[in-house]
Regions:
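N-terminal, polar/Ser/Thr-rich
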Residues: 26-59
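Zn2+-dependent metallopeptidase catalytic core
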Residues: 91, 95-101, 161, 168, ...
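A surface-exposed beta-strand-loop module
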Residues: 56-57, 61, 88-151
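Extended, low-hydrophobicity, Ser/Thr/Pro/Gly-biased non-transmembrane segments
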Residues: 127, 135-217
């Protein structure tokens, strides 16, 4: 994430209608340092095994223990590195910072000499040993889809955090993972089980680090979906009520089937939805993997439609990103940033298909689908104008101008426009589905990422040879407003817009183990004038606790649009509880309403039906 990666997709529940009033984000780091260029290449290694230990004792220390063993054929130094980021969470996270007590041993448990080459690389000298083991503890105290997090009875960890790789030796090596934990605890992962209990195999490093683990006490249930099993692993136990779980098991297999129709196949057998619900977490976030995804959510979202939309988004990533992705991201490079101009396709069009697959599966109706599209239109209209390609590139530095994740809604809307234009040009005989299916075959199936030439070539071919150079120049590389007055009637849709006034508090927060941490305060805002500072913990607004159910909607109702009204905040600053107050700031926002046009032409009605039902 990483988000508020929305993927990392993050939906900021506590900020849904108050942005930028309250914006909930996960911990982020500046993408400043990069690995020193010219790091020493490792000597070859083989027979790689990782052992992860998490039990009651390590849980008490909020850590896990990691051991990596491998064979060497010479005394040449072995250089081991830990990734700096997790694919899908487009930010540098410096996972090596949580390594504690690194050590190395050789044959006969003999201590070996080692040193550090840079911030995330260690050099080990075998000194005659044929098999080497390195080990360390790893701090697991960050509630983040791309990180490691523990409780007295539970652990989430990502392979990118804890599995070193031999520098410069490529990523095609196989590896085995063994989990050591309490006898009564469970393990959940998408990794292929080995022959021994709690042993798992990966054919290469990319697969190895794309399979997060749950270890401990959590619910684990399954149902048939596609050609395998859909498993839901949920922490804490009992966090998903029976009615919500039943709805998930009814809806998600249908969503998977609809998404599979787009690409012509379901590329995974079993799929594991891994979810953490935490009352101190004020958002919803998801991070995709090739046959699983990890959600972190406020308990208030469980059973709500917004959470199902996150599920649909992350599952669609199993095709779009985890398999079909831009050449800029093929293969993944784990030590530095990997910027691309294509996140509007990888994330934005994924978001479009999250909505499409839900309406096509009958999970939502057409009215709800149109509402979801209209919300994206409003979000884009209320944000600064930015080119899709520029927004995609900038995500690594988390712009503070309100565009850090704009490629999600704006990219989704670009997908809608392309879909409508293709259907209109082909008399509804082709669609964006054809583009996705063709790119999937031409890129992923041939072991490579797609290029801009391939993307626009596929779009043009689906539209019968129509040129999209002007579309690209104005709406992808450029910052022109989307031409809804000409696009929407082609699909039998009608748009209206209203200007509304909403309260703006001007504080950006992040949920952590201590509560709702203030990350940034906008100068001249309600919170800024009240004297709130980054590092404060926000406890309540006008006496209403931030942990209360329906906090955002109730806060909006309470504050109304009374510009200048006195607003009080209770915050914790260090050991002190302080009451702050400031005048309410109010801003204008555009609200959009999208409906089916009863006067649409027969062709437009066919196109609208094609969008909603996946038919031609």
């Amino acid at each position: 994430m990483h988000p508020p990666s929305i993927c990392t997709r993050v939906a900021c529940l506590a900020a849904a209608s108050l942005i930028p009033a309250i914006s909930l984000a996960q911990r982020t780091e500046p993408a400043g340092a990069t690995r020193a260029q010219g790091s020493e290449q490792s000597a070859p290694v083989s027979g790689i095994e990782y052992e992860v230990t998490f039990d009651s004792a390590s849980a008490a220390r909020r850590s896990l223990h990691v051991a990596m063993s491998f064979d060497v054929a010479s005394d040449a130094p072995v250089v081991l590195s830990i990734p700096a980021w997790t694919p899908g969470a487009y930010e540098i996270s410096y996972f090596a910072r949580d390594v504690i007590g690194f050590d190395a041993h050789g044959d006969g448990d003999r201590s070996l000499e080692w040193d550090k080459l840079d911030y995330d690389s260690w050099r080990v000298r075998p000194a005659g040993s044929k098999r080497v083991m390195v080990s360390f503890d790893y701090l697991a105290d960050t509630l983040d889809n791309a990180m490691s997090w523990s409780r007295p009875d539970f652990l989430l960890f990502n392979g990118t955090n804890v599995f070193p790789y031999p520098e410069g030796q490529g990523f095609d090596f196989p590896a085995t993972v063994r989990i050591h934990t309490e006898s009564g605890w469970r393990v959940a992962t998408g990794m292929t089980p080995g022959s021994a209990p709690r042993t798992y195999n990966a054919s290469n490093y990319h697969d190895l680090v794309d399979m997060p683990f749950f270890v401990g006490r959590f619910d684990l249930d399954s149902t048939r979906a596609g050609k395998g099993w859909l498993r839901i692993a949920a922490y804490p136990e009992g966090s998903i009520p029976p009615d919500a779980r039943a709805a998930d098991f009814q809806q998600l297999p249908s969503i998977i089937d609809e998404q599979g129709k787009v690409f012509g196949e379901i590329p995974f057998g079993d799929y594991t939805l891994m979810q953490i619900a935490d009352s101190g977490y004020g958002a919803i976030s998801g991070l995709e993997h090739q046959n699983s995804h990890v959600d972190v959510t406020t308990p208030l979202a469980i059973g709500q439609p917004i959470l199902t939309s996150i599920y649909a988004h992350e599952i669609f990533h199993a095709w779009n990103v985890k398999r079909m992705r831009p050449a800029d991201l093929w293969p993944y490079e784990y030590s530095n940033e990997q910027p691309t101009t294509w996140l509007w396709v990888s994330e934005g069009i994924t978001d479009y298909y999250a909505d499409l697959s839900r309406v096509r599966a009958g999970v939502i109706d057409s009215v709800a689908f149109f509402e979801a599209i209209a919300e994206k239109m409003a979000e884009v209209s209320n944000a600064p104008a930015v080119a899709l390609e520029d927004a995609s590139l900038s995500t690594w530095v988390h712009p503070e101008d309100g565009t850090s994740t704009i490629y999600y809604p704006k990219g989704a809307l670009a997908g809608l426009m392309l879909d409508v234009l293709i259907r209109d040009a082909s008399d509804n005989r082709a669609s964006l589905d054809d583009v996705m299916r063709r790119l999937y075959q031409e890129s992923y199936k041939k072991g490579r990422g797609f290029t801009g030439e391939q993307w626009w070539g596929a779009v043009s071919a689906a539209a019968g040879g129509k040129s999209f150079s002007d579309f690209y120049a104005r709406y992808v590389d450029g910052r022109d407003s989307y031409p809804w007055k000409t696009i929407l009637p082609l699909a039998g849709l009608k748009l209206t817009a209203d200007t509304i006034r909403i309260p703006v508090l001007g504080v950006t927060t992040v949920a952590d183990s201590g509560g709702l941490l203030v990350r940034a305060v906008a100068p001249g805002s309600t919170a800024g004038d009240a004297g709130m500072k980054p590092g404060d913990y926000l406890l309540s607004v006008n006496g209403m606790l931030v942990t209360e159910r329906r906090f955002v909607s109730r806060l909006r109702e309470m504050l109304g649009t009374r510009a200048g009204a006195r607003i009080t905040f209770d915050v914790q600053r260090g050991d002190q509880i302080m009451e702050l107050s400031g005048p309410l700031q109010v801003t204008e926002r555009i609200a959009m309403h999208l409906v089916a046009d009863p006067a649409a032409s027969p062709k437009a009605v066919r196109i609208r039906s094609g969008l909603l039902h996946g038919t031609r």
